[in-house]
Amino acid sequence: MYDADEDMQYDEDDDEITPDLWQEACWIVISSYFDEKGLVRQQLDSFDEFIQMSVQRIVEDAPPIDLQAEAQHASGEVEEPPRYLLKFEQIYLSKPTHWERDGAPSPMMPNEARLRNLTYSAPLYVDITKTVIKEGEEQLQTQHQKTFIGKIPIMLRSTYCLLNGLTDRDLCELNECPLDPGGYFIINGSEKVLIAQEKMATNTVYVFAKKDSKYAYTGECRSCLENSSRPTSTIWVSMLARGGQGAKKSAIGQRIVATLPYIKQEVPIIIVFRALGFVSDRDILEHIIYDFEDPEMMEMVKPSLDEAFVIQEQNVALNFIGSRGAKPGVTKEKRIKYAKEVLQKEMLPHVGVSDFCETKKAYFLGYMVHRLLLAALGRRELDDRDHYGNKRLDLAGPLLAFLFRGMFKNLLKEVRIYAQKFIDRGKDFNLELAIKTRIISDGLKYSLATGNWGDQKKAHQARAGVSQVLNRLTFASTLSHLRRLNSPIGRDGKLAKPRQLHNTLWGMVCPAETPEGHAVGLVKNLALMAYISVGSQPSPILEFLEEWSMENLEEISPAAIADATKIFVNGCWVGIHKDPEQLMNTLRKLRRQMDIIVSEVSMIRDIREREIRIYTDAGRICRPLLIVEKQKLLLKKRHIDQLKEREYNNYSWQDLVASGVVEYIDTLEEETVMLAMTPDDLQEKEVAYCSTYTHCEIHPSMILGVCASIIPFPDHNQSPRNTYQSAMGKQAMGVYITNFHVRMDTLAHVLYYPQKPLVTTRSMEYLRFRELPAGINSIVAIASYTGYNQEDSVIMNRSAVDRGFFRSVFYRSYKEQESKKGFDQEEVFEKPTRETCQGMRHAIYDKLDDDGLIAPGVRVSGDDVIIGKTVTLPENEDELESTNRRYTKRDCSTFLRTSETGIVDQVMVTLNQEGYKFCKIRVRSVRIPQIGDKFASRHGQKGTCGIQYRQEDMPFTCEGITPDIIINPHAIPSRMTIGHLIECLQGKVSANKGEIGDATPFNDAVNVQKISNLLSDYGYHLRGNEVLYNGFTGRKITSQIFIGPTYYQRLKHMVDDKIHSRARGPIQILNRQPMEGRSRDGGLRFGEMERDCQIAHGAAQFLRERLFEASDPYQVHVCNLCGIMAIANTRTHTYECRGCRNKTQISLVRMPYACKLLFQELMSMSIAPRMMSV
């Protein structure tokens, strides 16, 4: 490696990358990144970390199961029963396998799992050592090798997936799409994604100011032991507010109190120190205030010292804490023991849970108090909850590890219960039978299938929506879904702060892509080059620091701290160092050489506060930046040349990182670097803005996410428009995946003739938007022509539509399976007959074949039967005597959706997991654009089709070009989507030039002036205006019209799926009002506001008809004397009111059924509404 470097020592200046070369060079670097990483690497790496490290760690951390039978009181001497020890050791994960009902294993391919509704999972095996210890004999050890303990769902395209490392050709043979990124699971045939969950970083001290509470300031530390199942235990150190509710009259100044886990009341901070064994005031102050020459701070601590003056010994302090515990011990010894336990195990567990951690804990606690005092004195800024460096993202790895830990614990519990039963009877037990494999398999499957993250039994406590069904509308929507982030804040909270775009999100999270409405700003998406760390062990770093003259906290005198720099590793204070500058340089050098330190570790030096923080934990969001030294990029031309030939020389992104040219910087470290936006900023100028750059952006357009990268010229649009397009781009039709013909998706839209856009951004290459586009380049004119394009509607060219413009096909799949409910109830596919079947609908059963399934190619329409299925009726005792039962079966067939028509496209019959017959049927229907369908450009300019004119009625240019779409000029000024206009110009140039136009954001090489000049070179008007002729009259239209090719998308909202009306139809059982919703053929609600309007109109009869006659009319008989509903038998014309013994004076009242129901419900609660007839 060194020889190569020496050869390269020739003239450095020739090797620099010139700014004009940089335009191409940066994209070569970006391409190498995506070639190696892909777009879902953060999901795959996290899952691999779980399989390779976490599972083994969880299994090893579990204590061995120690069993002993209860002593049997036999006659004579009592012999010591044998002890059994079970230890779980090495784990093995096999390839994804499926066992058929006959028990034959076969490798399971993902597409088979999708089609047969199976779970794509791999079996997990473990070595178990069983030791039998009998008194007086030597212990007997038996190894149970590779015992099956459950199945783990496998993420597609991860290391353990069967598709990993296959070529495109192999993938095609397996019916998989080579472009599919993976990163999701297949659970019962449906694709599930794990959404990254945001949380506050653990083990870090935060100080916040409290408003309107008894505290002025609070410091908190959510402390969590690395890789353990223990819940986080939080400790708060707070300063009471002046004259607050909690202030005692006698106490002068502001006291400082701590809230400890499992201790009900707050404990004065000095008492906590004394309980840790630091008794003298001087000792305590040395741990809090490192510099005794600081009178202000000493003054702040004085009230706290005065308060704790009464308690001077450690045991008294421990007793003070113990007596405030959850259940205080009876004796003093018990209370002291309890307090010791809490301080050792529950307070700040990340500092240490073993014995003799008191010094470290005292220092950390002192640090917390010190930070609190600094904030109170205004010497240090308060922390920011929304700073992204204070956040961690839980991806598949940590989420699954959390679940697996719980499941494994349950498994061990069950094994213990099972084995104990046998041992108590004096027998040995069978290990294979003791392990309930369903616990792990079903537990993981349940959480992934429902999204309730946690134990099934405590479903209400679990987080909901962690796992979601992968969105397969467009390829972009799939990619975007795999890179989504979620903040678990209640959606109903009207808090603006967490929803706002924070400065620290630059380059990490897309600024445009977030949903509108209640989840705005809480659901985010990763920027293109952002990556989430998977976490590494801090031990090598700690060892390195030991060698590099870091002084341990146990060994120093507290006075030394004031001048030295504190070192934190993952939030835990490990020591101090005298020469921080040199230490940081060494650490950086090591990280860039990828020696000892992994490239995703972040190192922050806070010079003002004299702290160095090193983080190696999982879930930090980071991104690659180019390293600058002495105002020059370390990336040289030779690197670019090697990357250009990466097909031949295997030089990749990884080599760039290894040669120390690029490094990953996370949000916290980003605040300590000086970033140049382009290498141009590094050039020597007369007035240098900055001469200490340390890093340079690769390309500023990488701050955008998947959906925003598809927008051309997003830097020329008003920002909410980019947000609207990011949402609409996910609903556009296109080819969502190349193997759609072999998939049986519930819903799928496929465009007939998708085109790649004439105007693209460079980022689109990596999103595969050219291979799987979702739209058509249509000629768009901006004009008001006949007025049928007002209010965001568009006029379309009927002739173009007839030629296939924006025509699409819609697939819907139906699934059904046979099963056995009881011993006599079984469901079977067959063609039901009216003679033997009960409950058959008025529908056409003739299209079914004899096996009960419809044949492919048959045309079907609403309410036709597509799967015939019957269930045998159970035989009642009474019917056994009479031999001739009319009905032996009940019909439970599947019908086509009411409002749909189509042709049966494909029928698949197979066996499911239980070995029952199982079928899926796919129906296709052609959707031709019609009035009311929704279209949109790539700039948030959505519109519906207002009318379609034939080609001869459309305006035309002198060249004979007619537009496909005419949009209204009013759509532009107020929305300021200038990108839409520039795209049109650029598209016009591209069409003439015959090459794809570049519309990458923040690109100085392309501007409107340059495009306009090119356009005028081709003989067009500078700004794209043309003379148009009226299609109806043939006359010249007086004004010039802006016309050119613009990329349009057809969205999934179509009139055929929404049109709905009802005259009469089904009603609800309870209140006899019409059903709700199109799928149930429901009514249209005449709501409160509509009612108010009719009252204002004075249209009383109409109002009565809507709210009564057309809804739920009903007749009630009412007793004239008491006004309560009477008993009426209309057949025999007998009426009576039992209460009044009245049979004659009864009136008939008409009222809504809902009103009658309300009166009866009130009566059931002993309120009597009386209807007095006048």
From Swiss-Prot:
UniProt binding sites for Mg(2+): D792
Biological process annotations from GO: transcription by RNA polymerase II
SUPFAM superfamilies, A to Z: beta and beta-prime subunits of DNA dependent RNA-polymerase
Coiled coil: none
Binding residues annotated for RNA, in chain numbering: Q731, R841, R890, K942
Record-level GO cellular component terms: membrane; mitochondrion; nucleoplasm; nucleus; RNA polymerase II, core complex
Catalytic activity: RNA(n) + a ribonucleoside 5'-triphosphate = RNA(n+1) + diphosphate; a 3'-end ribonucleotidyl-ribonucleotide-RNA + H2O = a 3'-end ribonucleotide-RNA + a ribonucleoside 5'-phosphate + H(+)
Modified residues (N6-methyllysine): K1052
Cofactor binding mode and count: Two Mg(2+) ions are coordinated by both the catalytic residues and the nucleic acid substrate to enhance substrate recognition and catalytic efficiency.
An MF annotation (GO) of this entry: hydrolase activity
Cofactor dependency: Mg(2+)
Subcellular location: Nucleus
EC number: 2.7.7.6, 3.1.13.-, 2.7.7.48
ZnF C4-type span: 1119-1140
Pfam families: RNA_pol_Rpb2_1 (PF04563), RNA_pol_Rpb2_2 (PF04561), RNA_pol_Rpb2_3 (PF04565), RNA_pol_Rpb2_4 (PF04566), RNA_pol_Rpb2_5 (PF04567), RNA_pol_Rpb2_6 (PF00562), RNA_pol_Rpb2_7 (PF04560)
Binding residue positions for DNA promoter: K409
Record: residues binding Zn(2+): C1119, C1122, C1137, C1140
Modified sites of kind Phosphoserine: S937
Mechanisms controlling activity: Pol II enzymatic activities are inhibited by alpha-amanitin. 3'->5' exonuclease activity is stimulated by TFIIS, whereas pyrophosphorolysis is enhanced by TFIIF.
UniProt entry keywords in alphabetical sequence: DNA-directed RNA polymerase, Hydrolase, Magnesium, Metal-binding, Methylation, Nucleotidyltransferase, Nucleus, Phosphoprotein, RNA-directed RNA polymerase, Transcription, Transferase, Zinc, Zinc-finger
Annotated binding of DNA template strand, by residue: Q456, R1078, R1085
Record note on quaternary structure: Component of the RNA polymerase II (Pol II) core complex consisting of 12 subunits: a ten-subunit catalytic core composed of POLR2A/RPB1, POLR2B/RPB2, POLR2C/RPB3, POLR2I/RPB9, POLR2J/RPB11, POLR2E/RPABC1, POLR2F/RPABC2, POLR2H/RPABC3, POLR2K/RPABC4 and POLR2L/RPABC5 and a mobile stalk composed of two subunits POLR2D/RPB4 and POLR2G/RPB7, protruding from the core and functioning primarily in transcription initiation. Part of Pol II(G) complex, in which Pol II core associates with an additional subunit POLR2M; unlike conventional Pol II, Pol II(G) functions as a transcriptional repressor.
Family of this protein: Belongs to the RNA polymerase beta chain family.
UniProt cross-references to PANTHER family, sorted A to Z: DNA-DIRECTED RNA POLYMERASE I SUBUNIT 2
Function, in words: Catalytic core component of RNA polymerase II (Pol II), a DNA-dependent RNA polymerase which synthesizes mRNA precursors and many functional non-coding RNAs using the four ribonucleoside triphosphates as substrates. Pol II-mediated transcription cycle proceeds through transcription initiation, transcription elongation and transcription termination stages. RNA-dependent RNA polymerase that catalyzes the extension of a non-coding RNA (ncRNA) at the 3'-end using the four ribonucleoside triphosphates as substrates. An internal ncRNA sequence near the 3'-end serves as a template in a single-round Pol II-mediated RNA polymerization reaction. May decrease the stability of ncRNAs that repress Pol II-mediated gene transcription.
Listed name of the protein: DNA-directed RNA polymerase II subunit RPB2
